Design a protein with these regions (language model features):
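Eukaryotic phosphoinositide-binding membrane-targeting regions
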Residues: 1-168
Length: 168
């Protein structure tokens, strides 16, 4: 688990950040979070049809979406809206197993999963946890490329199994 969010004061009982609870960045309730839950089939992201328009993730639209994986390995996705909806929105700034961006092609095909998150700043270990969650939720790691970003140059793995085999 990413033990400490980038803004550790979120755990303070008097947390008064200018985002989230008192600012413009939305924090999801448990009920609202369920609308963002996703699964996988092969190398395809599965979002319930009734939620696609609401989440702004349409089948014919390629692009980037953000994700987090909670401690129960549930996978949540959404469109980043700078200043309004961030990685921290999903779990109200609380800890997660992993976070980043999914690059989607048409038909919800996954072109890449990475660990780009300014709030949580996950590393390769967290991205491995994400890969395991994707596999548990129906994804085929043989078909999904992963990119690890960090202090050095990005490392691209042609598939999730290569990421899991890597020493990090």
């Amino acid at each position: 688990m990413v033990a400490t969010p980038y803004w550790p004061e979120v755990h303070h009982p008097n947390h008064q950040a200018t985002h989230g609870r008192n600012g413009n960045v939305r924090y999801l309730s448990d009920r609202d979070r369920l609308k963002h839950r996703a699964t996988f089939t092969g190398n395809t992201l599965v979002i319930p049809p009734q939620r696609r328009f609401e989440l702004g993730i349409m089948q014919n639209t390629a692009g980037n979406i953000i994700y987090v994986v909670d401690s129960q390995r549930n996978f949540y996705v959404g469109r980043k809206n700078l200043g309004h909806f961030h990685h921290s929105s999903f779990m109200a700034g609380g800890p997660v197993l992993g976070a980043g961006t999914i690059v989607l092609g048409a038909g919800y095909q996954i072109l890449e999963v990475n660990n780009h998150s300014g709030h949580y700043r996950p590393g390769a270990r967290e991205l491995k946890r994400v890969a395991l969650a994707i596999s548990t939720l129906g994804g085929d790691l043989n078909q999904i490329p992963f990119r690890v970003s960090g202090a050095g140059p990005d490392v691209v793995y042609g598939n999730g199994l290569a990421l899991l085999d890597a020493a990090v």
